[in-house]
Amino acid sequence: MVNIPKTRRTYCKGKACRKHTPHKVTQYKKGKDSLSAQGKRRYDRKQSGYGGQTKPVFHKKAKTTKKVVLRLECTVCKTKHQLALKRCKHFELGGDKKQRGAAISF
């Protein structure tokens, strides 16, 4: 279980800052695939008409987790940069902190 706070003081590369400032932390999410990308246009053209599936469908999945990517936004100049963490099964953003000597509950 990885628990990351919602704010973090870290270095800002923005031209206005170039120093340590508070950053707002969010989790990176993949955007929607563009229908006008060259590969998608080619694939759709190839798929149309008779002949079934024309390219191999990938089945040999090897990884069980994805790397968590944090999106850090500077609260001063609004510059954004990304930071990759290690792989983990459970990721939490801004969850409760662990208490010393507290009983474990599931």
Swiss-Prot record:
The keyword Disulfide bond does not apply. Keywords: Antibiotic resistance, Cycloheximide resistance, Ribonucleoprotein, Ribosomal protein. InterPro entries: Ribosomal_eL44, Ribosomal_LSU_eL42, Ribosomal_zn-bd. GO terms for molecular function: structural constituent of ribosome. It holds the Pfam family Ribosomal_L44. Residues 1-29 have a biased composition (Basic residues). Signal peptide: none annotated. Transmembrane segments: none annotated. Cycloheximide sensitive type. PANTHER family: 60S RIBOSOMAL PROTEIN L36A/L44 (PTHR10369). This is Large ribosomal subunit protein eL42. It comes from Cryptococcus neoformans var. neoformans serotype D (strain JEC21 / ATCC MYA-565).
